Amino acid sequence: MTELMRIAALFAATALAEIVGCYLPWLVLKGGRSAWLLVPAALSLALFAWLLTLHPSAAGRTYAAYGGVYIAVALIWLRVVDGVALTRWDVAGAALALGGMAVIALQPRA
């Protein structure tokens, strides 16, 4: 697996853990679902925090690069879970964000 693919997969898993951890409380607060959903939400957010520690860069650089992948994963969530069709602007924005992530994550190491 190339370095970019490994980093992208780790970022995608991190983003999914964060989105699930935030979506479940949203279901409780906005959708009237059981408060028991807060338990897996907390576990998902703990997983998110742990996954962030697996990234090889300094925390600030990791968060900056992670933002690009988060945008793409959130748009996939929008399409798959929320059932909202993506626009060309959504796709273009995600492509730009992923390009920025690649520049930050794959910069030459001194």
Curated annotation (Swiss-Prot):
Pfam family, one: UPF0060
Protein localization: Cell inner membrane
Superkingdom of this protein's organism: Bacteria
Nucleotidyltransferase in keyword set: no
Transmembrane segments: 9-29, 34-54, 66-86, 88-108
Residue stretches in coiled coil: none
Entry keywords, A to Z: Cell inner membrane, Cell membrane, Membrane, Transmembrane, Transmembrane helix
Annotated membrane topology: Multi-pass membrane protein
GO cellular component: plasma membrane
HAMAP family recorded: UPF0060
Family of this protein: Belongs to the UPF0060 family.
Name the record gives this protein: UPF0060 membrane protein Bcenmc03_1254
UniProt organism field: Burkholderia orbicola (strain MC0-3)
